[in-house]
Amino acid sequence: MSTMTPAEIVSELDKHIIGQGRAKKAVAVALRNRWRRQQVEEPLRQEITPKNILMIGPTGVGKTEIARRLAKLADAPFIKIEATKFTEVGYVGRDVDSIVRDLIEISVKQTRETEMRKVRTKAEDQAEDRILDILLPSARPVGFGASSGAADTVDEGSTTRQTFRKRLREGLLDDKEVELDVEQPQVGMDIMGPPGMEDMTEQIRSMFANIGGGKKTRRKMKVKEALKALTDEEAARMLNDEEVKTKAVQNVEQNGIVFLDEIDKIASRNEAGGGEVSRQGVQRDLLPLVEGTTINTKYGMVKTDHILFIASGAFHLAKPSDLIPELQGRFPIRVELDSLSVNDFESILVSTDASLVKQYQALLATEDVHLEFADDGIRRLAEIAYAVNEKTENIGARRLYTVIEKLLEEVSFAAGNHSGRTVQIDAAYVDRALNEVAEDEDLSRYVL
């Protein structure tokens, strides 16, 4: 679990997301409260439930990006999923219980990786020994009953072994080929199951995956590759699978986070039925999950009482009040995200750690073409993106992808023929490339 303070979390989010201070603070406090709850004594700890968050804002302003970055910071089981993937129980499609099943799979993988890191050093030593046994089969220490004359051979072999171990750790033997027995990876089988029968489908899939598991095959590979394969094999052997499963379930129950995107798409604006699968049915199915229930998974029963749910939606066509009242009540914290201004667009282009400008400069630098963006060029790009959003559909920061792609279309196409060239992107260059398209509203609808 992350031990970062809210200020540290917001600072980390600021590196990738421009503006939206209220949303950042809300998720930062929610994440910190997970840690705070763990410090509370047990009788009261069970009573402290997470305060779920509903983020409301137009498309392209950073809702999904906050989720992506939060997943990396959380250091806890985290799943981002679209509400539109689910259908009401009884219809063809996935039911909402599969959210928890997917989350527990993520937790098992995380827990396994964490436990493997703990035994990594020991596993590496054992893998080195197995490699050295292959490289120096005669240098192994002799057992009981060895003649006294063999002692010198053992000492000499031990010295040689240490020399080879040193060379192995320095990477001097990486390119040498060895032949060894390695465990066959478990090959999964994709099985289509009926809706509502995910547990049975998963058990059948696991049964087929275990067939042939544990068998060894003889392979030739480089020492570097063999060392990695043997280290993974040794580390996996040291793990207690039951302990991993228990920790994974506990981690989901205490620290799990579900980010439910596009929740506005299941908000129904009218009471009349239609040809579509009932949206209200999906909302009703979500209720017990968000409130707290017990879901049966292949790793055991998982309680959802302390899982944090963060929902987001643009709410262009529907309003938060169009959600059924019971579901509204289960998201007590509401945060509105602001539409992006010209200044925000400008900051998105240059101020974030992996800004669009840096990405395109790095891409074209691979062909020895150097892009230099002048300040007035950046400003003009931001103004055009903002203007097109105002005149046509407002798709937020995603408009910048379209605009900059159109701007650099010719440069990217001919990059191979202009090695060593420096391209200066100023306001005049931007106007020449985009003005005609940006000014023509009909054309910009299709091109930008």
UniProtKB/Swiss-Prot annotation:
GO terms of molecular function: ATP binding; ATP hydrolysis activity; peptidase activity; proteasome-activating activity
GO annotation, biological process: protein unfolding; proteolysis involved in protein catabolic process
Keyword tags: ATP-binding, Chaperone, Cytoplasm, Nucleotide-binding, Stress response
Localization per Swiss-Prot or TrEMBL: Cytoplasm
Binding site for ATP: 18, 60-65, 261, 326, 398
Keyword Cytoplasm: yes
Top-level taxon of origin: Bacteria
GO CC aspect terms: HslUV protease complex
Quaternary structure, from the entry: A double ring-shaped homohexamer of HslV is capped on each side by a ring-shaped HslU homohexamer. The assembly of the HslU/HslV complex is dependent on binding of ATP.
Family: Belongs to the ClpX chaperone family. HslU subfamily.
Function: ATPase subunit of a proteasome-like degradation complex; this subunit has chaperone activity. The binding of ATP and its subsequent hydrolysis by HslU are essential for unfolding of protein substrates subsequently hydrolyzed by HslV. HslU recognizes the N-terminal part of its protein substrates and unfolds these before they are guided to HslV for hydrolysis.
PANTHER family per the UniProt record, alphabetical: ATP-DEPENDENT CLP PROTEASE ATP-BINDING SUBUNIT CLPX-LIKE, MITOCHONDRIAL-RELATED (PTHR48102), ATP-DEPENDENT PROTEASE ATPASE SUBUNIT HSLU (PTHR48102:SF3)
NCBIfam families for the chain: hslU (TIGR00390), PRK05201.1 (NF003544)
Name listed for the protein in its UniProt record: ATP-dependent protease ATPase subunit HslU
Organism of origin: Paraburkholderia xenovorans (strain LB400)
